[in-house]
Regions:
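Ribokinase/PfkB-type carbohydrate-kinase core domain
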Residues: 46, 57-72, 84-168
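Short, basic and Ser/Thr-rich N-terminal targeting/leader segments
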Residues: 37, 76-79
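Residues embedded in well-ordered beta-strands
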Residues: 20, 42, 81-83, 93-94
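Glycine-rich phosphate/adenosyl-contacting loop at the front of the ribokinase-like
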Residues: 1-46, 51-62
Length: 168
């Protein structure tokens, strides 16, 4: 995340004042918040084998989060977001690179099905490939697990899947 006195116009370079790097993403932030609130959270994501993955894994370890079901890609980098914030207006511009999360396969998703046995909630979002979200929502619905979906960043998702979501 970078702060700057004003956001650049197309083709403009502006000098920033602050730069911070850390873990994040909608799913990660939601999982951490639920964990800190006392929920029994198993983090499910797909990471590359890079320094961004190390940051995420180290943070999960420091927080005492379950990370034994994290998936890995040897071919694709960990997803990241480039965030610029205008210091005066607090307006931001964000570019999300889905990275490894966008490569979750149906087989990988199916391998996580047992996590929903006895689960009360599935908390998910769209910073991943939509087909994996649709598949896990369908599985959760069949198992009677309540589904919470953060619909950002906006991507097309079927009405059939949305009808299975308990909270958007």
């Amino acid at each position: 995340m970078g702060r700057t006195p004003h956001l650049p116009a197309p083709g403009e370079t502006v000098k920033g004042t602050v730069f911070k790097m850390g873990p994040g993403g909608k799913g990660f932030n939601q999982g951490v918040a639920a964990h800190k609130a006392g929920a029994d959270v198993t983090m499910v994501t797909k990471l590359g084998r890079d320094s961004f993955a190390d940051i995420a894994l180290n943070t999960m370890t420091e927080l005492g989060m379950k990370k034994d079901r994290v998936l890995y890609s040897d071919d694709t980098e960990t997803g990241c977001a480039l965030i610029m914030v205008d210091e005066n207006s607090s307006q931001n511009e964000i570019v999300v690179i889905l990275g490894a999360c966008n490569t979750i396969t149906d087989a990988e998703g199916d391998s996580l099905e047992d996590l929903l046995d006895g689960a009360e909630y599935l908390l998910t979002q769209l910073e991943t490939n939509v087909s994996s979200v649709e598949r896990i929502v369908d599985i959760a619905c069949k198992k009677g697990v309540k589904v919470i979906l953060n619909t950002a960043p906006v991507q097309p998702i079927s009405d059939e899947v949305l009808s299975k979501v308990d909270l958007i």
